[in-house]
Amino acid sequence: HGHHRRQRQMCIRDRSYPTKELVSLANSILSAVNDQNFVDIATQVSSALWRGDSVTLDEISSSYFATTSQVKEKLKTGNEIRNGKGYYFGSAYYYEKELYWGLDRLPYLEERLTELGARKKSENNEICALNLKAPKTLISEKKVNLYYYPSLNSPYTFVSTKRIREIRDEYPINLFMKPVLPMLMRKMNIPTNKAKYILSDAAREGRRYENEMKIIHSPIGNPARKSYSLFPAIDKAGKGFEYIEALLKASFQDGINIGDDNFLENLVTNLELDWE
C-alpha cells in the first residue's frame, strides 16, 4: 500500500510545474546564451527543467551563467519586445507581423517560410505537419456523446461550427449543446493584446477551414442574454445547434445585432418553430 502511495506521489510530482529554484537557474543560463547557440542550449535546458533534472542544469550553468540583475534586465527587455509585437505572454513565435502560439500554429509559419523559398532542403516533407485526418468511416455499435460548449462572443466558437456540423452529420454521435456565458460577461479581464490575438488567430483559422469572419457585431450584454433565454425551448425542440450556429453567423459574418426582436423572430420561424 505504501509503495503505491509513493508511486502516486511521484506521478503527481512528475506532472507538476518546475520549482522556482530550477526556473531561476534556467533563466540564468538562457540569459547568458548568445543567439547562435540559443536553440541548442534552450532545448537542453527546457528538457532538463521539465524533468526536474537539477544535475543537468547545474552542469550547463557552469558554462552559461547570468547574475540576478542581468536576468532581470534580460526579462524586462524581452517583455518589452513581446509587448511591442502585440502579444501578452511567452511561448509564442513572431515573424514579420504574424504571431504563432503553440505547436498547432507552427504549420502556418512553416507554410509561410516555404512559400518564401526559405526551405533549405528540397524534400516536400513537412516538419510541423499536424496529421489530423479523421477516419473516412467510424463504425460504432453505439453513438458517441459529444458535448459542445459554445460562447456567443467567441470567434473560435464561430469558426468551429462548420466542423461541428460536419462531425454531427458524418459520424455516429449524440450532440449535446452546453452554451456558456462569454468571458466578458463573467467579469473576466482580457488584456487588449490578448483580445487582438484571439481575433486575428481565429480569423486565420476561419480562412483555413473555409468559415471566415466578415462583419462583426459583438453580442455582449443584453443581446447574448436575450438569445440565450430562448435556447432551452429551442434545444428541447431539437434545433439547439442550428440556433446557436445561426446566432454566431449573424454576429461574426453578417454584423447583425442578435438581440433584435425581429431578427430573433425570423430566425425562430426559419427553424420551423412557433415564435409565439
Model-assigned labels for residue ranges:
Residues 17-18, 64, 147-153, 217-221, ...:
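Conserved strand-turn element in the central/C-terminal portion of the radical SAM core barrel
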Residues 31-32, 191-196, 232-233:
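Short, hinge-like loop/turn segments at secondary-structure boundaries
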Residues 29, 226-230:
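Conserved N-terminal beta-strand and adjoining loop/helix that marks the start
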Residues 32-35, 40, 44-137, 142-147, ...:
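C-terminal cap of thioredoxin/glutaredoxin-like
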Residues 174-187:
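Thiol-based oxidoreductase modules, predominantly thioredoxin-like and allied folds used
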